[in-house]
Regions:
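N-terminal anchoring/stem segment of glycosyltransferases
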Residues: 1-135, 139, 143-154
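GT-A fold catalytic core of metal-dependent nucleotide-sugar glycosyltransferases
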Residues: 132, 136-192
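Catalytic core and acceptor-binding pocket of nucleotide-sugar-dependent glycosyltransferases
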Residues: 165, 211-289
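Conserved catalytic core of nucleotide-sugar-dependent glycosyltransferases
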Residues: 165-241
Length: 289
């Protein structure tokens, strides 16, 4: 068995009923996840208990037996996951007049010279309006540490890979899928590896700029590194979330990864993705034939 564990999770926050371009159905997520079962990846999967029977039925037909499934529900999240316990805080901030003013000034901050392309439309993203979206994304590091604390991980490297990875990164196109499993030696031995879409510059230090302009920088679909660094990363992550709360900002995991890196750059190994597409982590870290 390879010395790498993948942790992933799915909890239905109602995204299938969203009426915008960010809509994704439960079917989309499940069909994406089933592709994992074609590989001998060692996986710890936290899965909505409303979906687990369907997935387990498919798992019985998989040639591999390397997935540990943990059923979850709302009560489980409220009891076990720090990020979910913070959900009321995210909701409170999103409803506040201060936060709404930040976002209502989005066009002014993005175009301080007054020159704006196209129509003056203030675009909102899920991380600005849906507290459950932020909570479930902040929970990634909490799921990893829960798996560690409960003995589900015995490998030297641990990765987060999104439940819907094959759908979002590969469009479920099997011709683009990885051919092999993950190579422990391709990960940094003393840092956590993240893909970034652009270099960090001085203006990125300002959390209000990141909230309002929402540049594509850190990606949260796939990241990983030495298992023994995950508790330190969790503590740093929680600290950075609290710092944003203190200035009345709720934002998604991509913003928090940036804040963590600014606070402790030595913890991170950053891979600049220059393809113009979202990075395919399972492909990048696969064993070379």
């Amino acid at each position: 068995m390879d010395d790498v564990t993948i942790v992933t999770a799915f909890f239905d926050i109602g995204r299938g009923f969203w009426s915008n371009t960010h809509k994704r159905t439960t079917k989309f997520y499940i069909q994406s996840f089933l592709n994992y079962l074609d590989y001998p990846y060692k996986i710890v999967c936290y899965i909505d208990d409303r979906c687990i029977d369907y997935v387990l039925e498919h798992y019985t037909r998989s040639p591999h037996r390397s997935v540990t499934f943990i059923p979850i529900n709302l009560k489980w999240l409220e009891h076990n996951i720090h990020a979910w316990k913070q959900l009321p805080k995210d909701a409170e901030i999103m409803k506040s007049s201060i936060y709404k003013d930040y976002l209502n000034n989005r066009l002014t901050i993005m175009y301080p010279n007054g020159v704006r392309p196209g129509k003056d439309v203030i675009k909102m993203f899920p991380e600005n309006e849906i507290p459950e979206y932020n909570a479930i994304n902040h929970a990634k590091i909490d799921f990893i540490n829960h798996a560690m604390q409960n003995g589900y991980i015995d490998t030297s490297v641990t990765c987060w890979s999104d439940f819907g990875y094959f759908g979002t990164q590969h469009k479920n196109d099997q011709s683009t899928f990885p051919k092999g499993t993950l190579d422990r030696d391709r990960f940094s031995k003393d840092r956590i590896t993240f893909f970034i879409q652009k270099e960090i510059v001085e203006q990125d230090i300002d959390p209000l700029y990141i909230l309002v302009c929402a540049p594509e920088m850190f990606t949260g679909t796939f990241w990983g590194g030495p298992t023994n660094l995950m508790p330190s990363f969790q503590a740093l992550y929680h600290e950075c979330v609290e710092e944003l709360y203190s200035v009345n900002i709720s934002d998604d995991d991509q913003h928090i990864y940036l804040r963590c890196c600014l606070k402790n750059a030595d913890l991170f190994d950053l891979k600049l993705n220059a393809t113009g597409e979202w990075p395919k982590g399972l492909l990048f870290f696969q064993k070379k034939s």
